[in-house]
């Protein structure tokens, strides 16, 4: 699953919303989740958000990819995986920043069976967004070319399916998720959230993919301004 959670406080109080999103993740039965717009111990949200979320999920593991300092803490991306998963490496890759744009990063968890990277490309500068996409491709090429494990890249690309940014990513990555609209959750008019598989890593079999619009234990129109995207694959 890939989900821009908007700091867990876009529309609802933080404590209520993080519990609801944890329930939604449980209901989805996702084995790994990439998350965008995460705060860590900021003035506006003085919580270690991923720590609280993974506790609510029953002891999952996490990595916070710090993109920039913010209000005394940090802001960035995250990946979470179940507690039983064997993690080999957790690290963060800085992405290029254009003038007037925010710093961005890739949060990476490498396990014994797969690699997951999460990022949130720039929303202000098309130049920065394209440069960031090229660095994402280079990161995969330099670290995971002919990798014997599948490598996944997920997140809010702030780019539509026909954009140069997505075309650039698709030179190195197969698009697994559907191109159904993901933003905004209350009036979805554009697809900007994606799940990719690196072409030069171990193959996977795509079973299904969909943008998630309904949960028994949560309301997507209250949880975030984005819709979560979900892909079921066999390794």
Model-derived features with residue positions:
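N-terminal, active-site-proximal structural segment of metallo-dependent hydrolase catalytic domains
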Residues: 1-56, 69-73, 134, 225, ...
